[in-house]
Amino acid sequence: MSSSVEAEASAAAPLGSNNTRRFVDSALSACNGMIPTTEFHCWLADRLGENSFETNRIPFDRLSKWKFDASTENLVHADGRFFTVEGLQVETNYGAAPSWHQPIINQAEVGILGILVKEIDGVLHCLMSAKMEPGNVNVLQLSPTVQATRSNYTQAHRGSVPPYVDYFLGRGRGRVLVDVLQSEQGSWFYRKRNRNMVVEVQEEVPVLPDFCWLTLGQVLALLRQDNIVNMDTRTVLSCIPFHDSATGPELAASEEPFRQAVARSLSHGIDSSSISEAVGWFEEAKARYRLRATRVPLSRVDKWYRTDTEIAHQDGKYFAVIAVSVSATNREVASWTQPMIEPREQGEIALLVKRIGGVLHGLVHARVEAGYKWTAEIAPTVQCSVANYQSTPSNDWPPFLDDVLTADPETVRYESILSEEGGRFYQAQNRYRIIEVHEDFAARPPSDFRWMTLGQLGELLRSTHFLNIQARSLVASLHSLWALGR
């Protein structure tokens, strides 16, 4: 990525208390959207019925404009655009495996994930999209206003321009409230990044049939349901500042104590000294680990094999690379084929939380993944595929996995099955949970772990390459717990 894009993505003007208050007020408003929350599912079903969608797995030789390169066996597009599936050789001193090979998606382009907001009847509303993606288990999910790679919005596919993208290109169509580069899955993407943006407009915006205005409270309420709010919406939500030094959610004293603890967490520990300590912990954790990730031809990837229909690991674990054909009546291109990554099983992603002095803290983890640009990012307490450890003694499991798997259901404060990026991953789902533990749990956690407040995580999200995509999804989920709506 060019330095000019990096600079532009960090150029959004600092938000004052008034803007923070407007974000908070919208998050606390779940009952006065342009579409009532009770009618949202009818609207989504209507959009599904008004369009035609189909995704089918196909053999590799039925891919159109994709081929295995003769010299490298990398899976590439004929135009040299979009992305490639290539090999990665990994060496690290993190975790149980010192080295391995794997396929990985290399998509060098920086995409745009943007939500357009407008004040309607005094409350900020978000223009959201019912977007079909080939990997979605339920076809349509709630997407940002714009969710597009550079190849998409420069029309490399020779299709139409994504609606509303002009609001997010250049400066002048609206006021930029959020603009920060964030990563995607480091296990499946090689150094993939997107601009997470929120742009406010004053003008009237024509609402196309697959779009609707919702308050932040409505979107956060929908996040408590399975497979409704897509990954790209979740990451943008996580980057919205719901606090500053003077402003945050103000809840009545009669509110449920856990909700109060979450709200307090937004404004606790965000002074410069506390943030410096958190950054110092993370930098020290990164310095402990070495990561050497070398791009190699797919033909040199050890322990993986290719059939007519997939590229898979010899042990049947991890994931496979497959091919699909897609048709959709409401996308920029009516039909296409593409490779996708298909995980072998549903993942388990959990954040352990506890109240310290009435303030909620989450146990986060400095985690190394092969595709990260800067070695490690801050992850949830647990992030894994449990099936990969079924034959492993429990004392060799990832830290705190047993606590997550044996948690009392009454301590689970949030639980949803959420989908990962449906444009590249085929039916990739994870169970996301927020689990409360007692106050003396892990008082001195392992050095790669740290208790942090929601406010501290929010401060780090003002910059790039701190929180990974899974942690950002859980930050958005935490916001849904204080923003119960009114």
Swiss-Prot record:
Entry annotated with the keyword Disulfide bond: no
GO molecular function: lyase activity
Keywords: Lyase
Superkingdom, taxonomy of origin: Bacteria
Remarks, miscellaneous: Two binding sites (pockets A and B) for the dTDP-sugar ligands have been identified in each subunit. It seems that pocket A represents the active site and pocket B is a vestige of the gene duplication event.
Gene from which the chain derives: spnO
Catalysed reactions, semicolon-separated: dTDP-4-dehydro-6-deoxy-alpha-D-glucose = dTDP-3,4-didehydro-2,6-dideoxy-alpha-D-glucose + H2O
InterPro entries per record: EvaA-like, EvaA-like_sf
Designated name of the protein: dTDP-4-dehydro-6-deoxy-alpha-D-glucopyranose 2,3-dehydratase
Binding site for dTDP-4-dehydro-6-deoxy-alpha-D-glucose 2: 187, 304, 367, 383-385, 388-389
Role summary: Involved in the biosynthesis of forosamine ((4-dimethylamino)-2,3,4,6-tetradeoxy-alpha-D-threo-hexopyranose), a highly deoxygenated sugar component of several bioactive natural products such as the insecticidal spinosyns A and D.
UniProt KW Transcription keyword: no
Record note on quaternary structure: Homodimer.
Family, as annotated: Belongs to the hexose 2,3-dehydratase family.
Known EC number: 4.2.1.159
Major enzyme class: lyase
Consequences of knocking out this gene: Cells lacking this gene accumulate the pseudoaglycone (PSA) containing tri-O-methyl rhamnose, but lacking the dimethylamino sugar forosamine.
